[in-house]
């Protein structure tokens, strides 16, 4: 109704950009007439104009430059990438520049849009960060889109997991830096644990553009980034707890009205908790031969609870995979493995005990921050995604980010077919396999989205039984390494790709296949064995060639004989069909000559895989180069691509005529947004395409959140299990379940944010104090300030101004002063008995300053400059030690404060108040410990060698 009365607010917003869009288009001919050097010269021209503006007017100046700057980027992109920004992409760029979220559908070129505001804001010289969800995408975008920025004279940096601090600092100093959210966050935490200013790698934050913003700011918001150190806990307790739990029986249903159900423990999948019943407690205590699981001297409750969760809530090949005797977490949103990440509070150790793996030591938090509070550190924040509108309220409330929906460049031609719901899971998977086979036979590519590694392997086995060649993209390491290759061919005629949770998200599926990427892979395959060091040559899978007489499309080769027994789906993986055709003899000869030329110039097998990858990527760019080797490499890639293009273009026509990409969803996700992301893979840029979801009444979403209505439906449908069910009531149950889950998780994220906000204020205070110390030229002044404050606190602790001075306990006061400052050993109570409280405070502070000067002269005799080093060392040591303990105390407070709700108290307010008192106490202890340490410090005598 409001839309009818007031008009669509999104349409009104878009209308506001039209005059600026007209201005950009008016610049197009003028900018196009410039030669390359003149176009590059525009960057320094813009910077000169910016330098003339004051800090307060810099934003206005950027806004004034926007039309011409965007026109320059559009022209550079045309020349370097062969891609011209559409008008809707220019609008997307304006939305990002204003610090909003731009919702752009899959395939509308979000990556290209980011080049516009990143160029404009990088002109300030203060740095722009472009954030992606994984290393592969960060690297791809830095190589691909970075060409435009490099062409225009800007420096482009890239942060990758295995970089050294020196490499990181160099890349953060660039005008535009591509990085993943986790690398940025961990670098921030590490910088705030540095003991030397030269160890800091990041500079002050300015402007940040987040790609797939919903994934990072919504999906990842519940998980804090944590840097931890090891602590010792008895490993045998984890093993014993796993043994005990394996004998306990799960209750068939949850207890009601405080009455325990039959069984040893109950599981609440919605809240993700496991609770022992009275019977379970008794049985556990008997098996462990202890009187009380909660005995503080020999606690067991924590170990048993974690073992129960490991048994019931953490599923192998869904939540984690086992690799090289290690339990590796699988990201529930992307389906990727997260090596190096571990669950905290002993949960990971419980999983290792369950899987009978070596148990790693437990960890203690040294530093942590949530993504919510990390990204709020940026003065200006913007983001892009294909699906933001469903979370619009959360973006607005938590991050103060508006969402603007950018129209598509071409109208959508995708058909979303009606859901098919089956009674059982096995019937659903059979139906998925049958539809996949049917669509595959028509020559259309199929993308099947699954929710776990385990489910993807089930479908892979079913397709293997029907001899359907397919590619599997999930968290298993052998598949992750082929991610780009799998996505490159996912749009080919008849291709079947099974992907876990959007694992290839961020990479477009191009109908007919991606000839550009196939050509790069081919050149890489030829050069890899000859140029990469033998110890690094864990060679990528080498695909077999398609024979010249094979038909167009993604069919099976004749040599895959049908009578071969299929033991596992790997037998029919479609890897051999990566390259669309055999190269001509002349092109093969060009590759051979190139190989000899590069061995001669670069050396025989001396490069690392990353170095070779870098050189191939540089050659695949269109940016100008003076290097003859890069030029030869570029010509070879172009030659291979032109041959592949012939077949790929043919396939593209076949695929379009057959109906485009078909996407199958095998389970409704907890969030409608994730379902929309999967659907959005089909029908990019107005292409034809279709989607369908297959569901079963046993799917997690319906089982956990659908409640009794779904249970009633299961009994009501007396149909054959292979017969799909269609029911309005079921559809409504699904939608209602999804909304319930979205609200439930929004509340959790909101709570995480509110509690972390308390920690965030404390974190900022501690980190700014640390930074002051690292940069500190005035450390002496700071330490004396700590001492003066300590003297003031001692005076007020031992002197009551309301009592006459004769009753003051000056003996104890003097004793306490000497505890901190032993150099005041000759101070006597009679020296201060005539002073009032203010005079007493001033006198003690004066004595402290004199004693500190004396201490400094003693220390400096040992080595000039040593006093400043000692000050820095002791302040940082105390901050880090006490902050670490404070984090643990705050965690414990947060665990216990929830119970206060039963006493009609607001847990959050209690947490804020007590947390604040604990923080003040920590800062007081830090000041006192530093003063004590400085006066007690005795440098070691110089050694004889010196």
Swiss-Prot record:
State the top-level EC class: translocase
Q: Give the Enzyme Commission number.
A: 7.4.2.8
Where, per UniProt, does this protein localize? Cell inner membrane; Cellular thylakoid membrane; Cytoplasm
Please give the residue ranges the record annotates as the region Disordered.
534-569
Q: Which reactions does this protein catalyse?
A: ATP + H2O + cellular proteinSide 1 = ADP + phosphate + cellular proteinSide 2
Residues annotated for ATP binding in this entry:
89, 107-111, 508
**Entry-linked InterPro entries:** Helicase_ATP-bd, P-loop_NTPase, SecA, SecA_CS, SecA_DEAD, SecA_motor_DEAD, SecA_preprotein_X-link_dom, SecA_SF2_C
Major place of residence: membrane
A molecular function (GO) term: protein-exporting ATPase activity
Q: Which GO terms describe its biological process?
A: intracellular protein transmembrane transport; protein import; protein targeting; protein transport by the Sec complex
In this chain, composition skew of type Basic and acidic residues spans 546-569
Membrane topology note: Peripheral membrane protein
Gene Ontology CC entries for this record: cell envelope Sec protein transport complex; cytosol; plasma membrane-derived thylakoid membrane
Sorted keywords for this record are: ATP-binding, Cell inner membrane, Cell membrane, Cytoplasm, Membrane, Nucleotide-binding, Protein transport, Thylakoid, Translocase, Translocation, Transport
UniProt xrefs under Pfam families? P-loop_SecA, SecA_DEAD, SecA_PP_bind, SecA_SW
Q: Which family does it belong to?
A: Belongs to the SecA family.
**PANTHER family reported for this sequence:** CHLOROPLAST PROTEIN-TRANSPORTING ATPASE (PTHR30612:SF0), SECA INNER MEMBRANE COMPONENT OF SEC PROTEIN SECRETION SYSTEM (PTHR30612)
Q: What does the protein in this record do?
A: Part of the Sec protein translocase complex. Interacts with the SecYEG preprotein conducting channel. Has a central role in coupling the hydrolysis of ATP to the transfer of proteins into and across the cell membrane, serving as an ATP-driven molecular motor driving the stepwise translocation of polypeptide chains across the membrane. Probably participates in protein translocation into and across both the cytoplasmic and thylakoid membranes in cyanobacterial cells.
On subunit structure and binding partners, the annotation says: Monomer and homodimer. Part of the essential Sec protein translocation apparatus which comprises SecA, SecYEG and auxiliary proteins SecDF. Other proteins may also be involved.
Its name, as the record gives it, is Protein translocase subunit SecA
Q: Write down the species.
A: Prochlorococcus marinus (strain SARG / CCMP1375 / SS120)
């Amino acid at each position: 109704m409001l839309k009818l009365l007031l008009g669509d607010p999104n349409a009104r917003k878009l209308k506001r950009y039209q005059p600026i869009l007209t201005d950009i288009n008016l610049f197009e001919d003028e900018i196009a007439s410039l030669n390359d050097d003149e176009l590059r010269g525009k960057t320094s021209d813009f910077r000169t104009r910016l330098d003339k503006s004051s800090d307060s007017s810099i934003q206005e100046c950027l806004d004034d430059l926007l039309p011409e700057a965007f026109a320059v980027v559009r022209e550079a992109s045309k020349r370097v990438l062969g891609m011209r920004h559409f008008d809707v992409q220019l609008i997307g760029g304006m939305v990002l520049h204003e610090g909003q979220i731009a919702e752009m559908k899959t395939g509308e070129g979000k990556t290209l849009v980011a080049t516009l505001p990143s160029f404009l804001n990088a002109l300030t010289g203060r740095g722009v960060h472009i954030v992606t969800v994984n290393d592969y995408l960060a690297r791809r975008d830095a190589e691909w889109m970075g060409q435009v920025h490099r062409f225009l004279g800007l420096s482009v940096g890239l942060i990758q997991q295995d970089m050294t601090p020196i490499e990181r600092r160099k890349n953060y100093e660039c005008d535009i830096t591509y990085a993943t959210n986790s690398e940025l966050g961990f670098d921030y935490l590490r910088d705030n644990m540095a003991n030397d200013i030269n160890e800091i790698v990041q500079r002050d934050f300015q402007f940040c553009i987040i790609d797939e913003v919903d994934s990072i700011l919504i999906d990842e918001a519940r998980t804090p980034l944590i840097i931890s150190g090891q602590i010792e806990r008895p490993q045998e307790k984890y093993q014993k707890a796993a043994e005990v739990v394996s004998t306990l029986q799960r209750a068939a249903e949850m207890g009601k009205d405080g009455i325990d159900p039959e069984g040893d423990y109950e599981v609440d999948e919605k809240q993700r908790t496991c609770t022992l019943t009275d019977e379970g407690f008794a049985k556990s205590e008997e098996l462990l031969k202890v009187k009380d699981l909660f005995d503080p001297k020999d606690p067991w409750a924590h170990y048993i609870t974690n073992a129960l969760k490991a048994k019931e809530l953490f599923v192998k090949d869904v939540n984690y995979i086992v690799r090289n005797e290690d339990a590796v977490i699988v990201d529930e949103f992307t389906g990727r493995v997260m090596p190096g990440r571990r669950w905290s509070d002993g949960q990971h150790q419980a999983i290792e005990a369950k899987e009978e793996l070596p148990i790693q030591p437990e960890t203690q938090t040294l530093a942590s921050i949530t993504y919510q509070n990390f990204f709020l550190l940026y003065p200006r924040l913007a983001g892009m995604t294909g699906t933001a509108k469903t979370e619009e309220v959360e973006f607005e409330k938590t991050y103060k980010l508006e969402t603007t929906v950018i129209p598509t460049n071409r109208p959508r031609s995708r058909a979303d077919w009606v859901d098919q719901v089956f009674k059982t899971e096995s019937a659903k998977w059979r139906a998925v396999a049958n539809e996949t086979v049917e669509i595959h036979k028509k020559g259309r590519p199929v993308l099947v989205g699954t929710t776990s590694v385990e489910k993807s392997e089930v479908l892979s086995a079913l397709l293997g039984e029907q001899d359907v060649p397919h590619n599997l993209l999930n968290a298993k390491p052998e598949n992750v390494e082929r991610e780009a290759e799998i996505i490159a061919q996912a749009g080919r005629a008849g291709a079947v790709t099974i992907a876990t949770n959007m694992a290839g998200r961020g990479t477009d599926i191009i109908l007919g296949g991606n000839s550009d990427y196939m050509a790069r892979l081919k050149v890489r395959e030829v050069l890899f064995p000859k140029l990469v060091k033998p110890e690094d040559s864990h060679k990528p899978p080498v695909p077999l060639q398609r024979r010249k007489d094979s038909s167009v499309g993604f069919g099976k080769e004749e040599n895959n004989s049908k009578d071969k027994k299929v033991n596992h789906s790997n037998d029919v993986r479609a890897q051999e069909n990566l390259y669309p055709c055999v190269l001509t003899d002349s092109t093969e000869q060009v590759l051979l000559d190139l190989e000899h030329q590069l061995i001669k110039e670069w050396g025989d097998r001396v490069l690392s895989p990353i170095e070779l990858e870098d050189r191939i990527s540089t050659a695949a760019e269109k940016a100008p180069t003076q290097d003859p080797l890069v030029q030869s490499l570029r010509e070879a890639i172009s030659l291979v691509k032109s041959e592949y293009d012939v077949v790929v273009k043919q396939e593209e026509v076949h695929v379009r005529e057959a109906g485009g990409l078909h996407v199958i969803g095998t389970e409704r996700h907890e969030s409608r947004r994730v379902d929309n992301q999967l659907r959005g893979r089909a029908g990019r840029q107005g292409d034809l395409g279709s989607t369908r979801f297959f569901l079963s009444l046993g799917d997690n979403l319906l089982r956990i959140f659908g409640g009794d209505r779904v249970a009633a439906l299961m009994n009501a449908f007396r149909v054959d299990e292979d017969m799909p069910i269609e029911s309005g009531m079921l559809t409504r149950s699904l939608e209602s379940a999804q909304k319930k889950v979205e609200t439930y998780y929004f509340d959790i994220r909101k709570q995480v944010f509110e509690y972390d906000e308390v920690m965030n204020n404390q974190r900022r205070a501690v980190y700014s104090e640390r930074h002051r110390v690292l940069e500190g030229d005035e450390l002496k002044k700071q330490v004396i300030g700590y001492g003066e404050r300590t003297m003031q606190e001692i005076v007020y602790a031992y002197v009551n101004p309301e009592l006459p001075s004769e009753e003051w306990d000056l003996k104890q006061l003097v004793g306490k002063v000497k505890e901190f400052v032993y150099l005041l050993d000759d101070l006597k109570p009679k020296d201060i008995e005539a002073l009032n409280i203010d005079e007493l405070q001033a006198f003690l502070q004066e004595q402290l300053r004199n004693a500190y000067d004396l201490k400094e002269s003693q220390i400096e005799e040992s080595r000039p400059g040593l006093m400043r080093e000692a000050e820095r060392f002791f302040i940082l040591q105390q901050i880090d030690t006490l902050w670490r303990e404070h984090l643990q105390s705050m965690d414990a407070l947060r665990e216990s404060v929830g119970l206060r709700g039963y006493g009609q108290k607001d847990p959050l307010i209690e947490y804020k108040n007590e947390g604040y008192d604990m923080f003040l106490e920590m800062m007081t202890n830090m000041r006192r410990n530093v003063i004590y340490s400085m006066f007690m410090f005795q440098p070691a005598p110089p050694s004889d060698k010196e």
